[in-house]
């Protein structure tokens, strides 16, 4: 589930999340693969310090271009499940 193949490249979604956490102002992140649209979507909870375009530029410092998310969704608070982990199931429903 954490590893995908996109345009001939193997991509670990966890690596994208780790890189996103290095961008200043990032609180929580979750990278998901939207199989229907064949794109990586990055859900980001930030302090609102960076506009999306600049956030993407910062992210490029930490990961190669082929790993960059095609879409970024900023949220005030990412949903959490009963175990206080990011609720990936709820986020996947937002992709539909």
Go through the PLM ranges and name each one:
Residues 1-96:
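AMP-dependent adenylate-forming
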């Amino acid at each position: 589930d954490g590893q995908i193949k996109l345009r001939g490249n193997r991509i670990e979604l966890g690596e994208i999340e780790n890189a996103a956490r290095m961008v200043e102002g990032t609180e929580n992140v979750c990278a998901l693969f939207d199989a229907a649209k064949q794109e990586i979507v990055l859900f980001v909870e930030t302090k609102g310090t960076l506009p999306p375009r600049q956030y993407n530029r910062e992210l490029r410092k930490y990961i190669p271009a082929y790993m960059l998310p095609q879409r970024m969704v900023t949220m005030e608070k990412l949903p959490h499940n009963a175990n206080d982990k990011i609720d990936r199931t709820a986020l996947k429903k937002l992709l539909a």
